[in-house]
Curated annotation (Swiss-Prot):
One of its GO terms (biological process) is ribosomal small subunit assembly. Transmembrane segments: none annotated. The gene is rps19. It comes from Methanopyrus kandleri (strain AV19 / DSM 6324 / JCM 9639 / NBRC 100938). It comes from the Archaea. This is Small ribosomal subunit protein uS19. GO terms for molecular function: rRNA binding; structural constituent of ribosome.
Amino acid sequence: MAEERSKDDIPDWWEKEWVEFRYRGYTLGELMKMPIEEFIELLPARQRRSLKRGLPSRHKKLLRKVRRARRLLRRGKKPPVIRTHCRDMIILPEMVGLTIAVYNGKEFKEVKIEPEMIGHYLGEFAKTRKTVEHGGIGATRSSLFVPLK
């Protein structure tokens, strides 16, 4: 958790793209330069407690992939879509601008991370249930396999 982000990690265009966005009074550029321990104090209580207890190995693995993609982005290359099952990972400022495919139980849903998503869970953006659009046969799980003549 004591990893520092260097100022070289942040491209020059980064602050210009999301100038008007602020999280708890800090711009995205300031959040990117901030040490992770300082950023944790800005989060709501549930997320703060979760991060203070330490990250499980699967979350650390996801962060390694995010940092690898961020390095590719700095070099001017398009980073690959990062696939993960970690629905309970909290979105951190270093994830902004990347595309993460989150598993919803059936398939991977691509989520483009925006600054407004900071502090939320990845699973909030990959719905596990389909919304019902009609009330006929097949609308509910119990009527999915009713023969249609």
